[in-house]
Design a protein with these regions (language model features):
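Short hydrophobic transmembrane-like helices used for membrane targeting/insertion
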Residues: 125-127
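Intrinsic-disorder-associated, low-complexity terminal segments enriched in Asp/Asn/His/Tyr and depleted
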Residues: 130-133
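Alpha-helical subdomain
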Residues: 1-123, 139
Length: 139
């Protein structure tokens, strides 16, 4: 089993490409975990709000999401472990404004968060000795 950490990468890809990557990881690495950061819709859709790392660069954020459970709909083998808010990490870095914003998770998720997923296996359900078209999730 592996832990994949994909930090600062996926937001630069289109949603379709992110979905493909997550499906390929789920195909090959059952029982593993994948962690990645996402930009929320406020950051992904804004020309004016950018992460510090993009200021002065032409790179574009191409995808973003607010709710980590959305990924479970894309790929049913991914089970959300946590959607962590950056305001919980290193509170002194964020200052008073960031700490206050951290009290409102819904607002924070509009900008960015860290998502962690367990990759579960889907095994076929057998009906009368033949694989059924539906799959049963296993941990």
């Amino acid at each position: 089993h592996f832990i994949f950490v994909v930090e600062g990468v996926l937001m630069y890809f289109y949603e379709k490409q992110v979905r493909q990557l997550l499906t390929r990881l789920a195909d090959r690495f059952s029982g593993s975990e994948v962690w990645f950061d996402v930009c929320g819709p406020m950051m992904a859709n804004s020309k004016y709000i950018k992460p510090d790392s993009l200021r002065g660069h032409e790179a574009q954020i191409r995808s973003g999401l607010k709710d980590g459970h959305e990924v479970e709909n894309w790929e049913p083998r991914l089970q959300l472990i946590d959607q962590a808010l950056y305001q919980k990490f290193f509170p002194k870095r964020w200052g008073l404004g960031g700490r206050l914003m951290g009290l409102f998770p819904g607002i924070c998720k509009k900008f960015s968060s860290l998502l962690g997923y367990k990759i579960k296996s889907l095994r076929p359900v057998f009906v009368r000795g033949h694989p059924h078209h539906l799959f049963k999730q296993t941990a």
